[in-house]
Swiss-Prot record:
Stated name of the protein: Ribosome-binding factor A
Keyword Cytoplasm: yes
Domain of life: Bacteria
Covalent S-S links between cysteines: none
Length: 125
């Protein structure tokens, strides 16, 4: 089994565990934890750090609150990872807002505008 394959499998397992932990979260929060999505996880080579990219259904302020919620409860989530995945040491979790969806929408809008401009140029010529 190659190291890259193992890393990908661990990232996938961590994502599953965190999603389950979000679903079972019982604490107080300003946001609805069931609307938080774990989009992707990037595990460091030494498996000591996990960058977790989070998305939330809501406006920008609510998205920031979702990341803050995850940061405030990182001990709960790290414990869930430690209990469910056999690792020598559970990775330190670092939560980030995922901007992939917004970026792809912005790029598609720009491409549509370019296409319209090219069509207008062709019509004018």
């Amino acid at each position: 089994m190659s190291a890259g394959y193992r890393k990908a499998m661990l990232e996938s397992e961590i994502q599953k565990v965190l999603t389950e932990a979000l679903r079972n979260f019982k604490g107080e929060s300003e946001i609805d934890p069931t609307l938080v999505s774990i989009v992707r996880i990037e595990l460091s080579k030494d498996k000591r750090y996990a960058n977790i990219f989070v998305s939330y259904l809501g406006n920008d302020e609510e998205k920031k609150k979702a990341v803050e919620f995850m940061e405030e409860n990182k001990g709960y989530f790290r414990t869930a990872v430690a209990k469910n995945i056999r690792l020598f040491k559970a990775p330190e979790l670092r939560f980030h807002e995922d901007i992939g969806i917004e970026a792809s929408l912005r790029i598609s809008k720009i491409l549509e505008e370019i296409k319209k401009q090219e069509q207008e140029k062709e019509e004018n010529e």
